[in-house]
Amino acid sequence: MDVLSCSIKTLKGLYDLSGVEVGQHFYWQIGDFLVHGQVLITSWVVIAILLGSATVAVRNPQTIPTVGQNLFEYVLEFIRDVSKTQIGEEYGPWVPFIGTLFLFIFVSNWSGALLPWKILQLPHGELAAPTNDINTTVALALLTSAAYFYAGISKKGLGYFSKYIKPTPILLPINILEDFTKPLSLSFRLFGNILADELVVVVLVSLVPSVVPIPVMFLGLFTSGIQALIFSTLAAAYIGESMEGHL
């Protein structure tokens, strides 16, 4: 009962995160739900950038690759290497998922620093990187959790759950809590880093608007890319762990 109670509290904590707010928000009413409209707008922009770039780069493949085709081939090779390293020989079906996570987070993070979101005025709140909202990072983390549970169950069936009593049943509560805390760490790490980066830039621009914020912005671009790599690498590692049965 204690384990079940802790698990329920952890899930409730993840649900309650959707109510966390930093600053003002532009709400849309969809049925009985209120959603953060500015997050949907910026997410659609990021998706449009990714789809548009991919379409332009690979719509007419060349034997001698163009710059765009070469870039996308390099990114694909990089994602395949990350997936193979973390998941193993059965990495193939998971490349699209890991690649989608990496590219969406990478472009979302960079959009917060490079796109002039502040030009567009909203009735309430302001536009920012999608990953600057806790709802986005929690959603990505929960997708990752669903993916590694699916990977483990599809590979081992119900025998997958035997890992919770290995190497000894005494560790059952710890093993269960470990799986429920993974999405917490993934979501808070990404959200905290992106929010902190944007807040630092805003504060420096307000204090010293000329030169000082520029190095910080370049550092933010670097850390934004690193955060995308960390998230996708951990997602691949969790999937590989569930398929191999490593604890």
From Swiss-Prot:
Q: Name one Pfam family in it.
A: ATP-synt_A
Per its UniProt record, what InterPro entries does this chain match? ATP_syn_F0_a_bact/chloroplast, ATP_synth_F0_asu, ATP_synth_F0_asu_AS, F0_ATP_A_sf
Keywords of the record: ATP synthesis, CF(0), Hydrogen ion transport, Ion transport, Membrane, Plastid, Transmembrane, Transmembrane helix, Transport
Annotated Gene Ontology cellular component terms: plastid membrane; proton-transporting ATP synthase complex
Kindly list the GO molecular function terms attached to this UniProt entry.
Answer: proton transmembrane transporter activity
A GO term (biological process) for this protein?
proton motive force-driven ATP synthesis
Mode of membrane association: Multi-pass membrane protein
Transmembrane ranges, per UniProt, are: 33-53, 95-115, 134-154, 199-219, 220-240
In Swiss-Prot or TrEMBL terms, this protein is called ATP synthase subunit a, plastid
Species this protein is from: Cuscuta reflexa (Southern Asian dodder)
